[in-house]
């Protein structure tokens, strides 16, 4: 391989690592700039397409663009659970709940131990009024958060899911009428 090609590949890898770093640090503008460099070098990079699209969707901005990026990632790798989750989450953020269900269910089926995917599916079920299913998915998410490796553990994400379960239980308890009480 030529030195020019090697340099080009090294630069693309550098931009990709930088994009992930900036996104993780909450520096979204810098992350976007790096993702654009990565996709300029390889417009079919499924990981970059998905990560960039998910970053936009999760922030609730440019949702049509986010959905397009994620669909392009899925076109490259149609069975990737993370990409399916991202698509479902982008639809969720657009209030396209009926469209969100299938990709989120597929993602949870393929990656049944991913706490984020399980939480997203729980969020969808809550929006659809499927309280029992929402609680079940959120509980699975909590259980999986307790199993993740220390380097991947995100206590704030675990706390968010636990709060959703508590809020759902409080709401359901308030909806019960005195005639519903068991002796």
How would you label these PLM feature ranges?
Residues 3-7, 41, 76, 110-111, ...:
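Structural marker of alpha-solenoid helical repeat scaffolds
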Residues 61, 133-183:
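Terminal, low-structured helical/coil segments at or just beyond the last alpha-helical repeat
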């Amino acid at each position: 391989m030529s030195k020019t090609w090697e340099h080009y590949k090294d630069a693309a890898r550098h931009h990709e690592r930088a994009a992930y770093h900036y996104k993780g640090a909450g520096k979204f503008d810098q992350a976007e700039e790096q993702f654009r460099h990565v996709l300029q070098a390889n417009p079919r990079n499924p990981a970059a397409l998905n990560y960039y699209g998910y970053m936009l969707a999760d922030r609730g901005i440019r949702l049509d663009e986010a959905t397009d990026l994620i669909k392009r990632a899925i076109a490259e790798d149609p069975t990737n659970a993370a990409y399916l989750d991202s698509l479902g989450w982008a639809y969720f953020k657009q209030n396209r709940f009926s469209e969100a269900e299938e990709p989120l269910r597929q993602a949870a089926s393929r990656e049944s131990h991913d706490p984020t995917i399980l939480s997203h599916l729980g969020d969808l079920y809550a929006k659809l009024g499927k309280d029992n299913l929402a609680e079940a998915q959120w509980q699975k998410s909590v259980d999986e958060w307790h199993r993740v490796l220390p380097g991947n553990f995100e206590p704030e994400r675990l706390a968010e899911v636990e709060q959703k379960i508590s809020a759902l239980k409080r709401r359901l308890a308030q909806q019960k009428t005195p005639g519903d009480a068991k002796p």
